[in-house]
UniProtKB/Swiss-Prot annotation:
SUPFAM superfamilies recorded: GIY-YIG endonuclease
Organism expressing this protein natively: Pediococcus pentosaceus (strain ATCC 25745 / CCUG 21536 / LMG 10740 / 183-1w)
Identification of the protein by name: UPF0213 protein PEPE_0875
Xref: InterPro entries: GIY-YIG_endonuc, GIY-YIG_endonuc_sf, UPF0213_domain
Position of the signal peptide: none
Family that this chain belongs to: Belongs to the UPF0213 family.
Residue ranges annotated for the GIY-YIG domain, each copy included: 7-82
Length: 95
């Protein structure tokens, strides 16, 4: 997966070491994933390192990116997996 080098508004999904999924929002994708892996990200991912970026989507504005994050977090686990598969993400070994 090629990560964009420019800042923007991004919704992203991480696969944690325990095979759980975490959705977030950022303006700097590379920095945010690095921070998650250093234990400086969300409390949820701090105990589930390392994390792997498996999906991201860019938006024109902060509101839309944050809305995508909110909608993802409201989904059930099975719905999150369906969303990722629909967007071309192949998931194996997920609990």
């Amino acid at each position: 997966m090629e990560i964009p080098l420019i800042n923007g508004f991004y919704f992203y999904v991480l696969r944690c070491a325990d095979n759980t999924l975490y959705g977030g929002y950022t303006i700097n994708l590379i920095n945010r994933v690095e921070r998650h892996n250093k234990g400086q990200g969300a409390k949820y991912t701090k105990a589930r390192r390392p994390v792997q970026l498996i999906y991201f989507e860019s938006f024109d504005n902060q509101h839309d990116a944050m809305s995508a994050e909110y909608q993802f977090k409201q989904r059930t686990r099975s719905s999150k997996i369906k969303f990722l598969k629909k967007n071309g993400i192949s998931l194996t070994n997920l609990k």
